[in-house]
UniProtKB/Swiss-Prot annotation:
Family: Belongs to the MsrA Met sulfoxide reductase family.
Catalytic activities: L-methionyl-[protein] + [thioredoxin]-disulfide + H2O = L-methionyl-(S)-S-oxide-[protein] + [thioredoxin]-dithiol; [thioredoxin]-disulfide + L-methionine + H2O = L-methionine (S)-S-oxide + [thioredoxin]-dithiol
Active site, per annotation: 53
Matches recorded under NCBIfam families: msrA (TIGR00401)
Full protein name: Peptide methionine sulfoxide reductase MsrA
Primary gene name: msrA
Keywords associated with the record: Oxidoreductase
Length: 215
């Protein structure tokens, strides 16, 4: 399989791998909550976050109260129904992303944003720690104007909080409207539940997100 000459750069959509029409097959139920993965219940909402390797990210969110399901997948790129091998080539444009399905009556998008900002380094560009490549970029993919507004506001708040702690690096988090989300292979789903001693590179920078109504 061809690979990008520099996996730390974004891929031109015209140069992306073509992918396939058939989605990858995943287990119908979540290994931790036992809730069905599809369809998303009508009273639930969805959030998409990229914070580096999706194994640790998915565990972070399924451990939170009132989370219905989490799923590891790929989004933000061009290739349809990509495989993990294709993602690692740097020729799909996708990031490793976790889809969170939650009940907005019991949990808030603001709370999910707080977990997002405080549990990874959003100023590393196309990497997260020792994991290097565009697939590991920091990203928020929004599904509504309200989510988009909150995501942008939270980025501004977190940037100020970083500066107050003498961290003047610019945040590189991508915030865009969500495109297609493609489920990762089944062995990636709830990986750290199935493999408790598995790799997890997740870690924050010691900065807290201020309340959204605070300057």
């Amino acid at each position: 399989m061809p690979t990008s000459a520099n996996k730390s750069l974004s891929i031109d959509p015209h140069s992306a791998l073509p992918g396939r029409t058939e989605p990858l097959k995943v287990s119908p139920n979540h290994a931790v909550t036992d809730h069905t993965i599809e369809p998303v219940p009508e009273n639930m909402e969805v959030a998409y976050f990229g914070m580096g390797c999706f194994w640790g990210v998915e565990r972070l969110f399924w451990q939170q109260p009132d989370i219905y399901t989490t799923s590891a997948g790929y989004s933000g790129g061009t290739t349809a129904n990509p495989t993990y091998e294709e993602i690692c080539s740097g020729l799909t444009g996708h990031a490793e992303v976790v889809r969170i399905v939650y009940d907005p009556a019991k949990n808030s998008y603001e709370n999910l944003l707080k977990l997002f900002w405080e549990n990874h380094d959003p100023a590393q560009g196309m990497r997260q720690g020792g994991d290097i490549g565009s697939q590991y970029r920091s990203a928020i993919y929004t599904v509504s104007p309200q989510q988009h507004e909150l995501a942008l506001a939270s980025r501004e708040h977190f940037q100020k909080a970083m500066q107050q702690q003498s961290d003047n690096r610019p945040i590189t988090t991508e915030i865009t409207e969500a495109g297609p989300f493609y489920f990762a292979e089944d062995y990636h789903q709830q990986y750290l539940f199935k493999n408790p001693e598995g790799y997890c590179g997740l870690g924050g920078i010691g900065v807290c997100l201020p309340k959204m109504n605070e300057n």
